[in-house]
């Protein structure tokens, strides 16, 4: 098991780690919000999901309303016809969903998937901005570096409780692997 803490589960310790993680995730997702809004006009669902993530990070309860905001942003992603806007909305959805990360699922594929809840806002924001900039990989690299540099200690602690992201062959899986490695490296230096 890749963890330095006992299995966190649904404990107050886990919630204490998830709150600053949600604030970081909201900041990451916010980087791509304009990509969505330029393409999808007045659809406020991703913006509301990011606000919900910030609310949880600032002390609001993890409740049905927050889960509904995440699902609404997910629907916005599915309804968009623009790939960059879809990824931007997914970043927002995952920012709101950070509050529901299962910290007790920390091994194997389940652990990899839970880590993606944490990494997803930055990764999907990076990919949205990369595609919007005509596939400029430097844009994504800059966003991932900023996300790694700004990741609070709580993100590092949570990721150390979960397996590393596999390298993969798709651009998306490569970005997940890259951000995960950057945060883990920064945490040990």
Task: Annotate each language-model stretch with its function.
Residues 2, 150-189:
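Acidic, carboxylate-rich catalytic segments that either coordinate divalent cations
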Residues 2-148:
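Structured binding/interaction patches within domain cores
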């Amino acid at each position: 098991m890749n963890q330095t803490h006992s299995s966190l589960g649904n404990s107050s310790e886990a919630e204490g780690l998830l709150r600053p993680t949600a604030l970081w995730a909201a900041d990451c997702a916010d980087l791509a919000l304009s990509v969505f809004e330029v393409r999808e006009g007045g659809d406020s669902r991703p913006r509301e999901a990011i606000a919900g993530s910030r609310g949880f990070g600032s002390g609001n309860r993890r409740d049905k309303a927050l889960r509904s905001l995440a699902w609404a942003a997910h629907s916005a992603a599915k309804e968009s016809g623009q790939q960059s806007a879809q990824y931007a909305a997914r970043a927002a959805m995952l920012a709101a969903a950070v509050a529901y990360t299962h910290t007790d699922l920390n091994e194997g594929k389940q652990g990899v998937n839970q880590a993606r809840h944490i990494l997803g806002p930055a990764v999907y924001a990076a990919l949205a901005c990369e595609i919007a900039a005509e596939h400029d990989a430097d844009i994504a690299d800059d966003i991932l570096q900023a996300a790694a540099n700004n990741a609070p200690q709580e993100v590092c602690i949570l990721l150390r409780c979960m397996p590393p992201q596999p390298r993969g062959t798709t651009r998306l899986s490569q970005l997940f692997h890259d951000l995960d490695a950057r945060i883990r490296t920064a945490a040990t230096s």
